[in-house]
């Protein structure tokens, strides 16, 4: 049987019922635990908030499954020798696209003239159209 260590206690309540259901739907026979002997762990579900930072004892682990799309907080961890996967989800992608578009428009439209305006003075300057930039 596969043993999956959910190594993010602060997020367990959010995943406690959803992960077993998803494993069942995928036909994966696995035991999902929040504590385990490192020698028994096949996969680690991880997020940067996890107290688990030393992966050295997890010699049997086949992969670390990161709940976040970003991996910048873990890639420098010298104890991580297992393959690292990151979350890929349409909602994460959509949210990141919206965030990038929003900040790009903020920059190109010069919105900080209005947002960061301690004198509360109206600036009637029209930004150029995109094709004119």
Please report, for each region that a protein language model flagged, where it lies by residue.
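Glycine-rich NAD(P)-binding loop of Rossmann-like domains
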Residues: 113-133
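Phosphate/diphosphate ligand-binding glycine-rich loop within oxidoreductases
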Residues: 42-118
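A short alpha-helix capping/helix-coil boundary motif
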Residues: 32, 79-81, 126-127
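Phosphate-coordination loops involved in phosphoryl transfer and adenosine-cofactor binding
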Residues: 1, 81, 131-133
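N-terminal glycine-/charge-rich "phosphate-binding" loop or analogous flexible N-terminal tail
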Residues: 1-42
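A generic alpha-helix propensity feature with a strong bias for hydrophobic helices
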Residues: 12, 60, 127-131
């Amino acid at each position: 049987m596969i043993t999956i260590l959910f190594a993010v206690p602060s997020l367990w309540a959010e995943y406690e019922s959803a992960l077993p259901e998803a494993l069942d739907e995928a036909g994966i026979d696995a035991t999902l635990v929040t504590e385990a002997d490192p020698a028994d762990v096949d996969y680690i579900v991880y997020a940067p908030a996890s107290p688990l930072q030393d992966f050295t004892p997890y010699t049997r682990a086949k992969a670390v499954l990161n709940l976040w799309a970003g991996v910048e907080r873990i890639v420098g961890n010298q104890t991580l020798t297992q393959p690292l996967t990151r979350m890929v989800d349409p909602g994460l992608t959509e949210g990141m696209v919206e965030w990038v578009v929003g900040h790009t428009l903020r920059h190109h439209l010069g919105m900080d003239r209005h947002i960061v305006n301690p004198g509360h003075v109206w600036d009637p300057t029209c930004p150029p159209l995109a094709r004119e930039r």
